[in-house]
């Protein structure tokens, strides 16, 4: 969008659904991006919705605010009367996203019906909607993780250091390395160790699994991704709650 509208300002705002459980580095990068490119940003707060009694926080060892984002997201989209929301989802990430259209229609409740999707022939997209409905538009649906990194290398676009190898205190839970943080309650047998890791996908600290890696440059990451046999969301604990976890959330209005 920045390149498409340059030298003019991007005419639409960014929307961040803030769970309050973010990596601090992600928020620093978000604020830098907004200021550097003179962008507008709206922030929907999950914590505010909890405080107002609109949603209830999960409890227990695997508690996460991931699902709670849906209510806040739909509320913000309704307030803004948006016709469409642009996202970076890709089909190679997860099986539910693999069958989603470029123009993903959402009904008046913000819900997605995977059995009622519109045909998309070549580059022809149907943008018709009724009042109260909207679209989630995913321009890079057919890109792979490797495509993304090759593009970033070509554009030399600045990125948060979370994507590059760094030392962090982590512990293992159900085969996933999780960052040690104040938002996660550890079990007695979960031991914290400092490891050299990086993030392949970034969400809440409570559900973002990290990967052991020494890739400290984009070129090294490209080599690593090219030989990887696991998808980037393979470390996301929120996708492991059930076989259809992502699809169930998307039906409710998730990203």
Regions found by a protein language model. Name each.
Residues 1-255:
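Nucleotide-activated chemistry modules centered on ATP-dependent adenylation/adenylyltransferase
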């Amino acid at each position: 969008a920045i390149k498409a509208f340059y030298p003019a300002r991007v005419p639409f705002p960014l929307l961040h659904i803030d769970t309050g459980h973010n990596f601090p580095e992600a928020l620093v990068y978000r604020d830098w991006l907004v200021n550097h490119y003179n962008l507008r940003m709206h922030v929907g707060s999950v914590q505010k919705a909890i405080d107002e009694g609109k949603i209830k926080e999960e409890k227990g060892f695997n508690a996460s605010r991931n699902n709670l984002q849906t209510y806040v997201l739909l509320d913000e989209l309704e307030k803004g009367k948006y016709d469409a929301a642009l996202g970076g989802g890709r089909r190679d990430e997860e099986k539910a996203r693999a069958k989603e259209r470029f123009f993903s229609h959402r009904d008046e409740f913000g819900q997605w019906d995977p059995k009622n999707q519109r045909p998309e022939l070549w580059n022809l997209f149907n943008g018709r909607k009724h009042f109260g409905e909207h679209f989630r538009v995913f321009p890079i649906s057919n890109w792979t993780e490797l495509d993304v990194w090759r593009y970033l290398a070509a554009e030399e676009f600045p990125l948060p250091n979370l994507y590059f190898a760094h030392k962090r205190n982590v512990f293992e839970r159900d085969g996933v390395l999780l960052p040690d943080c104040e938002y996660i309650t550890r079990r007695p047998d979960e031991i914290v160790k400092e490891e050299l890791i990086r993030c392949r996908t970034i969400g809440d600290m409570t559900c973002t699994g990290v990967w052991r890696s020494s890739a400290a440059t984009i070129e090294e990451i490209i080599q690593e991704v090219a030989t990887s046999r696991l998808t980037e969301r393979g470390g996301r604990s929120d996708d492991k709650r059930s076989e259809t976890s992502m699809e169930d959330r998307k039906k409710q209005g998730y990203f």
